């Protein structure tokens, strides 16, 4: 009896100790705490507010981990309560899912806990997906659960190319379609919601043909497997891209935070650790690089760009920086790259053949005055080297049957969208094309049109500024903010930023005293921003755009969000402003001419 009581006591002690620490390694916990305090000094503690939230020690450590490494936008645009809710859902999977205790702390921390997958707007998908998927995968082994989640994803989203802006998981479901970057973001979010480590894998450019692709890796029972997002197969490690992937030069993913896993690190920043996954897909080789100046001395912190030939250009697939000894290295598929090294206006380059070259020295002996006019290069991609996993006829037939059924579910949902035929008698016929393009967001666009029927010209002008994707996910409160604002500059979008909060009426009031002078001379607005908005000192920070309201609130941002902020404020005050779609310069119009904005 005493032995039983002692055993129970020790079990309780161990469990409570585990529960109190999200990060069990004290050294890493101290590193995270140091990074958290540094972040608070940059953004201000008002954006980390746990008052009234009843945060446990374990939850607080998880919050500190997220805040330590999240982009500034995620700290200033989403309240602490939002992040805490998602943490609680993630921690719940440790006890509610059968694999919860099998997932290593390292993988849970970096590939389950984080909400952000790529550059999508964050949403409330985690709790929603957990409620639906936890029941659906009940009783399944981990690998089968991954396959089942992908079937669920296929019921809701299929492939369609679109613009560069990435929709959130819930926005993708509403639309029923997404490009590969959106499908993989959605599938990673679904897997993480039930405690399965998952990451978006990306080949920035194929080596053997134009284009790129993104898919998913998920961890089960000690191993990472790949799958085509929203493209279910009977088994893992099988997708349409098995053969192209075997010919790739680079595969990478961004692990949230300071990740200390076994993979080769390509870049480590204060937000993420970019890791090289090429070894999972084909035959690879490593080359050591040494960067020297014209005198042959090692160059510290030289930027080294590894370039793949694609779309008739040498595209930078990854950038690394040399150490104090002037060296760096890369593992890649056995093909050719151009390696371009530079620092302080000096540069040099060389062709690297992975699988043949072992080490290469690049001298920074060129500049703008003496750069070569041409170079004769033969670029050879890796050879195909594919071994497909076995699939029985019964497995293939069952998978095909399921795909057909899943298509019918998705098609039934899409059939609820308005069509030209169903809208042929609509009284506000000029708005019909916008309502049809809105797909799953059609009720919002239709309600907006009808609410402002007495201001139809302005309402239609506003809708005409929106892209097809904007029509599919623009909320009513953003439309109304732009509709009710006094400004004639109706467009709410500058580039591919997230539009999360209303801002035009806010800035009308915030700059009421300065508005007249800013309209007369927009350079004064440029000067105001230069004097009042600090730049994030971290030059390698992940540039997720902040909303203009959070730039105003935090008074700290990066150059991208600062430029968006300028255009949004200018338009709010009736000043015509834009991002030049060709040169990507911020401009305002004065005396009928576009004037470039220079913040430097």
Enumerate the predicted regions with their spans.
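Bacterial Sec-dependent N-terminal signal peptides
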Residues: 1-21
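Hydrophobic/aromatic-rich core segments of domains that either
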Residues: 22, 131, 135-136, 140-141, ...
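Secondary-structure boundary elements
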Residues: 24-175, 211, 397, 406-554
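Extracellular beta-sheet/turn segments enriched in Thr/Pro/Gly and aliphatic residues
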Residues: 268-280, 353-391
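A short, amphipathic beta-strand motif
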Residues: 285-296, 600
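Short, ordered, surface-exposed loop/turn motifs in non-cytosolic proteins
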Residues: 294-313, 334-336
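Short, acidic Ser/Thr/Gly-rich low-complexity loop/linker segments typical of extracellular
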Residues: 310-331
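Short Pro-Gly-centered beta-turn/loop motif in secreted/extracellular proteins
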Residues: 326-338, 342-346, 353-356
């Amino acid at each position: 009896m005493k032995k039983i009581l002692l055993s129970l006591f020790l079990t309780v002690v161990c469990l409570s100790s585990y529960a109190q620490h999200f990060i069990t390694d004290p050294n890493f916990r101290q590193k995270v705490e140091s990074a958290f305090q540094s972040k608070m000094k940059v953004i201000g503690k008002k954006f980390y507010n746990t008052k009234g939230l009843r945060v446990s020690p374990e939850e607080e450590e998880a919050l500190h981990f997220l805040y330590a490494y999240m982009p500034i936008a995620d700290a200033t645009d989403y309240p602490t309560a939002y992040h805490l809710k998602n943490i609680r859902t993630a921690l719940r999977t440790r006890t509610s899912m059968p694999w919860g205790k099998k997932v290593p702390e390292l993988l849970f921390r970096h590939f389950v806990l984080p909400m952000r997958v790529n550059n999508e707007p964050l949403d409330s998908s985690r709790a929603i997906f957990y409620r639906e998927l936890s029941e659906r995968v009940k009783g399944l082994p981990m690998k089968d659960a991954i396959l089942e989640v992908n079937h669920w994803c296929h019921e809701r989203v299929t492939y369609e190319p679109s613009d560069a802006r990435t929709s959130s998981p819930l926005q993708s479901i509403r639309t029923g379609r997404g490009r590969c970057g959106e499908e993989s973001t959605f599938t990673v979010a679904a897997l993480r919601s039930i405690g399965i480590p998952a990451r978006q894998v990306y080949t920035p450019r194929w080596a053997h043909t134009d284009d790129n692709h993104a898919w998913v890796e998920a961890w089960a029972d000690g191993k990472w497997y790949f799958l085509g997002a929203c493209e279910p197969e009977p088994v893992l490690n099988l997708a349409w891209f098995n053969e192209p992937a075997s010919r790739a030069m680079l595969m990478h993913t961004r692990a949230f935070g300071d990740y200390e896993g076994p993979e080769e690190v390509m870049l480590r920043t204060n937000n993420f650790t970019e890791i090289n996954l090429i070894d999972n897909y084909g035959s690879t080789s490593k080359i050591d690089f040494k960067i020297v100046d014209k005198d042959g001395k090692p160059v510290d912190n030289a930027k080294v760009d590894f370039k793949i030939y694609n779309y008739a250009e040498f595209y930078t697939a990854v950038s690394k920086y040399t150490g104090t000894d002037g060296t760096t290295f890369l593992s890649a598929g056995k093909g050719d790259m151009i390696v371009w090294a530079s620092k302080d206006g000096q540069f040099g380059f060389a062709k690297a053949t992975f699988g043949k070259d072992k080490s290469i020295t690049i001298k920074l002996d060129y500049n703008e005055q003496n750069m070569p006019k041409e170079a004769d290069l033969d670029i050879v991609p890796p050879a195909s080297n594919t071994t497909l996993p076995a699939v029985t006829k019964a497995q293939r037939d069952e998978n095909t049957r399921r795909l057909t059924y899943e298509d019918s579910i998705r098609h039934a949902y899409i059939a609820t969208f308005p069509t030209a035929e169903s809208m042929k008698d609509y009284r506000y016929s000029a708005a019909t094309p916008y309502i049809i393009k809105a797909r799953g967001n059609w009720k919002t666009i239709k309600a907006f049109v009808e609410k402002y029927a007495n201001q139809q010209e302005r309402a239609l002008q506003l809708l005409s500024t929106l892209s097809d994707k904007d029509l599919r996910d623009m909320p009513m409160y953003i439309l109304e903010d732009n509709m009710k604002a006094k400004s004639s500059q109706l467009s709410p979008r500058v580039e591919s930023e997230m539009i999360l909060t209303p801002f035009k009426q806010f800035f009308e009031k915030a700059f009421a005293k300065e508005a007249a002078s800013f309209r007369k001379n927009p350079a004064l607005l440029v000067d105001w921003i230069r004097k009042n908005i600090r730049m994030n000192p971290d030059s390698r920070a992940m540039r997720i755009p902040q909303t203009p309201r959070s730039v105003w609130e935090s008074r700290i941002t990066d150059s991208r969000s600062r430029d968006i902020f300028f255009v949004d404020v200018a338009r709010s005050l009736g000043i015509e402003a834009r991002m030049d779609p060709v040169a990507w310069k911020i401009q305002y119009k004065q005396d009928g001419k576009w004037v470039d904005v220079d913040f430097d």
